[in-house]
Amino acid sequence: MPRQPGHNTVECIQAMLAGEVQVFIGLGGNFAQATPDSPRTRQALRNCALTVQISTKLNRSHLTMGRDALILPCLGRTDIDRQACGPQAVTVEDSFSMIHASRGQLEPLSTQMRSGQAYMYS
């Protein structure tokens, strides 16, 4: 894991456009569509040597990629996440701003699927 502070969203886009960032890793979300200037963000993503999207489902950001690209499917919060240390949970916020643990109830589509966190820590 990085030991120094990274970029915020705007700084990341500027660094990609300037060629200072060559790899983009998106953990969930729809980065290109969620930023204030989507056309500029799409150009920044195209400037990357590699874009990696770790996602539960396809979205528009997957259509804009760097020179090389990976789309890695990951478990959603409804999927059971079994790790060597035991079953895992994610936190969710309800409409009353209360945080709860959510454990999936569905068998994953494949034994090869991992959670987004498992991709980051393996």
Predicted regions and their residues:
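Non-catalytic alpha/beta scaffold blocks inside enzyme catalytic domains
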Residues: 1-122
